[in-house]
A protein has these predicted regions:
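Sequence context surrounding c-type heme c attachment/ligation sites in exported
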Residues: 168, 326, 342-469, 473-477, ...
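A cross-family structural signal marking well-folded subdomains
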Residues: 226, 239-378, 388-389, 562
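A conserved hydrophobic secondary-structure block that centers on an alpha-helix together
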Residues: 123-174, 182, 195
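Short, functional "switch" segments adjacent to catalytic/cofactor/reactive centers
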Residues: 69, 78-134, 438-487
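Bacterial N-terminal signal peptides that target proteins for export
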Residues: 2-15
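Bacterial signal peptide processing site
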Residues: 27-29
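C-terminal motif of bacterial Sec signal peptides marking the signal peptidase cleavage site
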Residues: 23-25
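Extended, well-ordered alpha-helical scaffold/bundle regions in very large, multi-domain proteins
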Residues: 148, 187, 200-209, 213-259, ...
Length: 562
């Protein structure tokens, strides 16, 4: 009964509109860009969770997983712009929506989460339903509901309430419907005419608010940002700057920064990380979770709490550990409960920066041994934005796994690649970097020997020779490619796409401003969020066809759930 009504509700939902971003003059030195056509991005699991928790509270449980996004141009945020919802994917969204709505109207929660009480709990209450959907819908849709959207939600809720003699059953049904519409599941670039823009279009104030909030807080706009959008403040430089400054000062910025680095560093891989526990008995799922958390805590503390230079995340000795990591690093944990505490590695310790933490070292290793190739490839691709080609399909790996020489070290094994022309080119890019981490095994435990031989951890990073992991960390700190890569990927993350050709000059401008600030991540975020480029859009290449395609695509996404 309920699912058939939700299908009918979806059929009545308003088709998703296109969005565009307006050009508003920011600074004379900022290069102007044309932007890109309006787009729509599917919420990530974390964004979905954040929005629901911000609206209804963190006690609302979201247990199910959604269809995975495809990592595109090095980011899931870019892949979200190409995401569709399959029939099985819709069922997952529907099941989660129904669970969330049920928790909202539960007897333990309704008094707090439903802003009014019905005159009669056994009947529909039009006024109370309207109040609920107006308040909740404004946050879920990141804008006020249209009159048709309101009528659809209220009518559906009233019908179910009267049918089941239960006002809250109607609210549950109507809320379930809101949570499976494209207007909630997708961040949509809605546009309006703007004669002052070269494209003739600009993002609506609400679309600008959504861009800001998902970049800085990884969630929907709060009340103050929505009010600024309604008042037209986000169409002025000062209005945008005022909101950006407020949001950067908020504790929620840490959540937004965590989300970016989780995507940037491909930490999603932790969900499928496996290790041979016979070889590594210290490895557990809890240790892996702590390793991921340590990476993110270190980065957020350094770049947000301390506002320290970004390149120093590769050399800092300050971090956080818990009992799980204490065993891996062989350092004492002072808290009786084994919880998180600040820790600083001594000057004579080989560990320095995030690349010598368990998180990076275990993530880019094989289940039963370390991998200089995987680690070097991760440094090249994730942190330097340099593509390493995949190995040829006809490589005979038996050449490098000689059963008559099982005791060879990693360096000796990898040297064999230099004798095979089809392998040598790529391995020369990765192995001289990754060998610098060979004093750390497949889960990041320190060692000085492998197969009875002392480990040689010397190497080379783009012409800069190093003798150990600490000097490799310093080479990363000093590399101009490191901040350039971060700048490019942060802008791609913010825009949901790789920079357009005419935006390259703007990205170089961001790099220059980033350097001028002493590599402050907060300044880089502020420069992006207050720029013209972040909101600039062009007309679709073929406006009529693109708009029709958008409507059909939206309709298809709705009908796939039927």
């Amino acid at each position: 009964m309920l699912i058939s009504k939700v299908k009918r509700y979806l059929g009545q939902a308003t088709c998703v509109a296109f969005v565009t971003i307006a050009l508003t003059a920011c600074g004379e030195s900022e290069p102007q860009t044309g932007g890109a056509p309006p787009d729509m991005r599917r919420l990530t699991v974390e964004q979905y969770r954040n929005v629901v928790h911000d609206v209804f509270g963190e006690h609302i449980e979201i247990a199910s997983r959604f269809e995975p996004l495809i990592r595109t141009d090095g980011l899931f945020a870019v892949g979200a712009s190409n995401a569709l919802i399959t029939p099985s994917g819709f069922e997952k969204f529907y099941n989660v929506a129904r669970s969330v709505a049920g928790q909202v109207v539960d007897e333990d929660n309704r008094a707090v989460l439903v802003p009014c009480a019905p005159v009669d709990m056994a009947r529909a209450d039009d006024a109370c339903s309207r109040q609920f959907f107006a308040e909740v819908g404004r946050y879920l849709y990141r804008r006020p509901l249209s009159e048709s959207e309101m009528e659809t939600a209220v009518s559906a809720a009233n019908e179910v309430a009267d049918q089941f003699d239960d006002f809250y059953a109607g609210i549950e049904f109507g809320l379930t419907g809101l949570l499976v519409t494209p207007s909630f599941l997708f961040i949509i670039d809605e546009t309006e005419a703007d004669s002052s823009s070269s494209s003739g279009l600009r993002l609506t104030g609400y679309a600008k608010a959504a861009r800001l909030s998902f970049l800085l807080w990884n969630s929907a706009p709060d009340d103050m940002l929505l009010k600024a959008a309604a008042a037209g403040d986000l169409h002025t430089d000062k209005g945008v700057e005022r909101q950006v400054e407020r949001m950067i000062q908020s504790h929620l910025l840490a959540r937004g920064v965590r989300a970016f680095f989780e995507d940037f560093l491909d930490l999603e891989k932790f969900e499928t990380l496996e290790k041979d526990t016979i070889i590594y008995p210290a490895y557990t799922i809890n240790a892996a979770n702590s390793a991921k958390e340590q990476l993110l805590r270190t980065i957020v503390d350094h770049t947000v709490n301390q506002d320290a230079p970004y390149p120093e995340i590769f050399t800092t000795r300050s971090t956080f550990i818990d009992a799980q990591l204490g065993r891996i690093y062989r350092v004492p944990v002072t808290r009786p409960d084994g919880g998180w505490e600040a820790y600083e590695f001594p000057e004579d310790d080989v560990r320095a920066g995030i690349l010598t933490q368990m998180g990076f070292l275990s993530l880019f290793s094989h289940p039963g041994r370390s991998s200089a190739t995987l680690r070097g490839k991760a440094v090249r691709e994730l942190l330097l934005c340099q593509k390493v080609p995949d190995p040829p399909g006809d490589v005979d790996f038996s050449l490098f796994n000689d059963p008559d020489a099982p005791s060879r070290t990693a360096r000796e094994r990898l040297t064999a690649h230099s004798t095979v022309p089809s392998c040598a080119g790529c391995h020369k890019l990765t192995d001289p970097i990754g060998l610098g981490f060979e004093q750390f095994d497949g889960i990041g435990q320190f060692r000085v020997a492998e197969q009875g031989a002392m480990i040689d951890v010397s190497g080379n990073l783009d012409g800069n020779e190093f003798g150990d992991a600490k000097s490799l960390a310093q080479a990363m700190h000093d590399s101009p490619s490191v901040p350039a890569c971060l700048t490019n990927q942060l802008y791609s993350y913010a825009a949901g796409r790789a920079p357009e050709r005419d935006e390259r000059e703007f990205v170089r401008y961001l790099e220059s401003e980033f350097a001028e600030s002493g590599y402050s991540l907060k300044v880089l975020l502020r420069d992006i969020a207050t720029s013209d480029a972040f909101y600039a859009v062009t007309q679709p290449k073929n406006k009529t066809e693109d708009v029709r395609a958008a409507s059909l695509n939206s309709k298809t996404k709705q009908e796939r759930g039927s």
